[in-house]
Regions:
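A structural signal for short, well-ordered beta-strand segments and their strand-loop junctions
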Residues: 11, 39-41, 81-85, 118-121, ...
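Short secondary-structure boundary/capping segments
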Residues: 28-30, 157, 204
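Core AdoMet radical
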Residues: 1-24, 28-67, 83
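Radical SAM enzyme [4Fe-4S]-AdoMet core and its adjacent flexible, acidic
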Residues: 46-160
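Flexible mid-to-C-terminal extensions adjoining Fe-S/redox cofactors in radical SAM and related proteins
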Residues: 172-222
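C-terminal accessory regions of radical SAM enzymes
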Residues: 148-182
Length: 222
């Protein structure tokens, strides 16, 4: 509620299933009232694939939440935006976003009556559990070489770190969602969301790492 008073656009990243938990079932109404943009993870439009990747029961819960968000106007009203996120289930780059988005929209609407605004096909960044998987399977070097070869300088102007600020659960500020996972706070004196109520964060040096190649590969991932 507080940050929406100061930010022109507020976006929240969600795995959807958390919004099916009784303690959080009123959150979608809050998002609607504040016009919060929702970025929701849905690994695939097929139950078998999603349940294999995320666990049994995740897909039907995700569908239930998406249908509820549609009922609230998300994906239908101009100022209630919901975008879905696709990640490859392995050490490879995502397919072309435009074609995949068309398939997602057709499958979800035909099978469940679900509508959404856009699909983001995001490259798996070599951080967190995915990094652990790559090292465990001895795939890290090969995967990084894929990212290096797919580097596209045309993606740089649209990177999230150049246009947005990510806020951690404790209010700490990060250049992007991936730096949040890596606990790489923004550079400069302003480090907490409470400071943004008094002054703008201004120009700063973006903190980077090897994981940044995930956002600059192919058509870009942020």
């Amino acid at each position: 509620k507080e940050i929406s008073k100061y930010a022109k656009t507020v976006m929240v990243r969600t795995n959807l299933v958390i919004l099916a938990v009784p303690a959080y079932r009123d959150i979608p109404e809050l998002y609607r009232d504040l016009k919060v943009q929702i970025v929701a993870s849905l690994p695939y439009y097929n139950e078998k694939v999603v349940n294999k990747q995320r666990g049994k029961g995740v897909f039907p819960k995700s569908i239930e939440v998406l249908q509820r968000l549609n009922e609230l106007g998300y994906g239908k009203e101009e100022d209630l935006v919901i975008n879905l996120v696709y990640n490859p289930n392995g050490a490879y780059l995502p397919p072309k976003q435009e074609a995949l988005e068309k398939t997602y929209k057709k499958k979800l609407f035909d099978n469940f009556g679900i509508v959404f605004n856009n699909l983001f096909a995001i490259t798996n960044n070599p951080i967190g559990r995915f990094s652990e998987f790559l090292h465990r399977e001895d795939l890290y070097a090969d995967y990084m070489n894929k990212l290096f070869r797919a580097y596209n300088p045309a993606t740089l102007p649209g990177l999230m770190c150049r246009n947005m600020i990510s806020i951690g659960p404790d209010g700490s500020l990060y250049d992007c969602d991936f730096n949040l996972i890596e606990k790489l706070n923004v550079s400069g004196e302003i480090q907490h969301v409470s400071q943004l109520t008094k002054e703008h964060i201004g120009v700063r040096r973006i903190r980077t790492g090897m994981h940044c190649y995930g956002c600059t590969a192919g058509a870009g991932s942020s």
